[in-house]
UniProtKB/Swiss-Prot annotation:
It catalyses: L-threonylcarbamoyladenylate + adenosine(37) in tRNA = N(6)-L-threonylcarbamoyladenosine(37) in tRNA + AMP + H(+). Required for the formation of a threonylcarbamoyl group on adenosine at position 37 (t(6)A37) in tRNAs that read codons beginning with adenine. Is involved in the transfer of the threonylcarbamoyl moiety of threonylcarbamoyl-AMP (TC-AMP) to the N6 group of A37, together with TsaE and TsaB. TsaD likely plays a direct catalytic role in this reaction. The keyword Cell wall biogenesis/degradation does not apply. The gene is tsaD. This is tRNA N6-adenosine threonylcarbamoyltransferase.
């Protein structure tokens, strides 16, 4: 089965075609991503209206390029899949409406994919990973530990009770006058800094629950920087190094508890695995800390290639292909959802507002 996937949930416009054979093995036939970093850089973050307009301008030609790269015509794909949430509603509408139109025009089945499910299933595309396994999703909008039991069978073990880790990186970078996007900038500066200079907090460290928290760490960075004004270059590098070290310690503690729970629930699992996905997974220091953690706990550490860790359409096409193998297509009446938890049966997370829990 060959599936055309479309991703427009945030600030990347993407189209891809993925093939899944009868044995469940996958192959990427094309994968095209257009980033909007230049459009949003002057504002220091993603502007939803600008993102939606950029998707409108780029998506048609990206779909054409994905088809051309795969050597296919639209009628030769077997299904169309698109991200239906969670994400910025304007971008979701652009991608979803385009995918529906293509599916209708080519008379192909349509699958509305949860963006988080795309991340959750990527390791099955790249590594053929069997169920069950653990997923750590760390990005600008999400920080979650998810137990992946099967297609559509997910349990959120832990989530952030305040800020996503990617947001903490971006806010730290902005506070220190570093360029957008903030994550790579903080990582570069941290390489030159002294991680022991500032004693920053490790939120929730040692607690039994499996959730994450980063707002206190972000506040501590602000207070530290304020006390040092005007900041020298050495101050900035040392703050970045201390911040990154605090994050690595926090993740190791929080994730380690989830690894122990997994071993308790699945004592006979021959190859326990931790999958790390999301843009923050590109950080080499954090990856090294998590890889060492997995080694100590007897887990395989799996991080898909960087271009498949960040937002892309190959993961959406693959999730559509996985669902197509066992489920009926979705209706073309399905609406986008700015908030769409991967495990809707789970209890709401801490700190939910009037509009409900974040995905």
């Amino acid at each position: 089965m060959r599936v055309l996937g479309i991703e427009t949930s945030c600030d990347e416009t993407a189209a891809a075609i993925v093939q899944r054979d009868d044995m469940g093995e996958g192959r990427i036939l094309s994968n095209v991503v257009l980033s909007q970093i230049a459009e949003h850089e002057p504002y220091g973050g993603v502007v939803p209206e600008i993102a939606a307009r950029a998707h409108v301008e780029a998506l048609d030609r990206l779909v054409d390029r994905a088809l051309n790269d795969a050597g296919l015509k639209l009628y030769e794909v077997d299904a169309v899949a698109a991200t239906a949430g969670p994400g910025l509603i304007g971008g979701l509408i652009v991608g979803l409406m385009t995918a529906k139109a293509l599916a209708m025009a080519a008379q192909k089945p349509f699958y509305a994919v949860n963006h988080l499910e795309g991340h959750a299933l990527t390791a099955r595309l790249t590594d053929g990973l069997p169920f069950p396994y653990l997923l750590l999703l760390v990005s600008g909008g999400h920080t979650q530990m998810v137990l992946v039991r099967g297609i559509g069978d997910y349990e959120r073990l832990g989530t952030t009770i305040d800020d996503a880790l990617g947001e903490a990186f971006d806010k730290t970078a902005k506070l220190l006058g570093l360029p957008y996007p903030g994550g790579p900038a903080v990582e570069r500066m941290a390489l030159q800094g002294d991680q022991k200079r500032f004693a920053l907090p490790r939120p929730l460290k040692g607690e039994a629950r499996l959730d994450f928290s980063f707002s206190g760490l972000k506040t501590a960075v602000r207070q530290t920087a304020t006390e040092l004004v005007p900041l020298t270059d050495q101050d900035v590098t040392d703050i970045c190094a201390s911040f990154q070290a605090a994050v690595a310690d926090t993740l190791s503690d929080r994730v380690g508890r989830s690894l122990e729970r997994f071993k308790t629930e699945f004592p006979d699992c021959a190859t326990p695995s931790l999958v790390v996905a999301g843009g923050v997974a590109a950080n080499k220091t954090l990856r090294a800390a998590l890889e060492n953690l997995c080694t100590r706990h007897g887990f395989a550490f799996i991080a898909p290639p960087l271009n498949l860790c960040t937002d892309n359409a190959a993961m959406i096409a693959w999730a559509g292909a996985e669902r197509a193998a066992t489920q009926a297509p979705d209706s073309l009446d399905i609406a986008p959802r700015s908030r769409w938890p991967l495990d809707e049966k789970s209890a709401p997370v801490f700190g939910t507002g009037r509009r409900g829990a974040k995905a």
